[in-house]
A protein has these predicted regions:
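Conserved HGGG/HGGXW glycine-rich cap/lid loop of the alpha/beta-hydrolase fold
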Residues: 40-83
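Flexible "cap/lid" subdomain of the alpha/beta-hydrolase fold that forms the substrate-access gate
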Residues: 16-27, 34-36, 46, 81-115, ...
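Catalytic histidine-centered segment of alpha/beta-hydrolase-like enzymes
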Residues: 277-286, 290
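Short hydrophobic "strand-cap" motifs at the C-terminus of beta-strands
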Residues: 50, 76, 248-250, 274-277
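Sec/Tat signal peptide C-region and signal peptidase I cleavage site
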Residues: 11-15
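Bacterial N-terminal signal peptides
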Residues: 2-10
């Protein structure tokens, strides 16, 4: 009960990002030397939803509620993000995949579908590549994967300046200004910045202003060079992923390139475009995103 009260108190006041319904239970799960905040609801075959930067697992609420009618839905906050614990290290995506595998073990889930966005894609690839027998389908949404496909060319994009924005001085610059920093991404990477409303921005700014949160977010990016090494090794050792993959790019962001990237790492890829959206698919066009994901998982 004390844990439940503490978690509810941590929810930023006044946010319109919808809290998960009472049918979902939130708990801290010990895994791989840390603890992840995990929401679980529904019944049926399992599906794991992984978020990325400037979001938390809260982003998936509309999809999670829809899937819970016939799935057991598992929604963690990644290591060092949201309401999960903030360890000093372990931010390679290969290691964070072990976090998620440990969550599945704790919940006695052997196999699951997987839906990922942004940095969640990177953890998702490392999970599927290390445990291919445990991931039955994968929906990967609007972000590249270190070391896979045209990664080196993608790094040249001026929109990705933040991949190298880190260190003590950068953290001091951002401290107390988390809202300003996050607004840059909501505005620059969206098709229409007004679709990320004021309450949503306040909600995530409050979560990223929690102690150590921005430092750990920067650590996610700092791990990219090692992630690229790890992913190339995983692909070389295991070959292309065999499970069905739906690669969704936002119309005003990755677009069809998302599927092209995934075809370098998976052999059964279907491409799709989330229309009228930039990178923030669940904020900008949740109805289309939910419809495309649920249709694919139902096949």
């Amino acid at each position: 009960m004390a844990l439940a009260v503490a978690l509810l108190a941590a929810w930023p006041a006044g946010a319109t990002v919808l809290p998960y319904p009472a049918a979902f239970q939130a708990r801290m799960i010990a895994t791989n030397g840390t603890q992840l905040y995990v929401r679980v609801g529904g019944s049926g075959p399992a599906v794991v939803l992984l978020h990325g930067f400037a979001d938390t697992g809260d982003m998936w609420e509309p999809l999670a509620v829809k899937l819970a009618s016939d799935h057991t839905v598992i929604v963690p906050d990644l290591r060092g993000m949201g309401l999960s614990a903030h360890p000093d290290g372990g931010y390679t995506k290969k290691n964070q995949a072990l976090d998620i595998a440990g969550v599945m073990d704790a919940l006695k889930v052997d196999k699951a579908d997987l839906v990922t966005h942004d940095i969640g894609n990177m953890v998702g690839y490392a999970l599927a590549a290390q445990f291919p027998g445990r991931i039955t389908k994968w929906v990967v949404i609007d972000a590249p994967i270190p070391g896979i496909g045209p990664w080196d060319e993608i790094l040249k994009s001026p929109l990705l300046w933040h991949f190298n924005f880190r260190g003590p001085d950068m953290e001091r610059l951002v401290k107390g200004r988390e809202r300003i920093y996050l607004d840059r991404f909501y505005n620059e990477l969206s098709a229409d910045r007004t679709r990320i409303d004021e309450a949503t921005r306040r909600h995530y700014a409050a979560l990223y202003a929690r102690p150590h949160a921005m430092h750990d977010a920067f650590e996610q990016f700092a791990a990219f060079p090692q992630d690229a090494v790890d992913d190339k090794a995983l692909l070389a050792a295991g070959g292309k992923l065999a499970m069905p993959v739906l690669a969704l790019g936002a119309e005003k962001s990755m677009g069809a390139q998302e599927a092209d990237i995934l075809r370098a790492a998976a052999s059964n890829v279907t491409g799709g475009i989330v229309l009228n959206s930039g990178h923030w698919i669940m904020e900008e066009n949740p109805d289309a995103t939910v419809a495309m994901v649920t249709a694919f998982l139902a096949k």
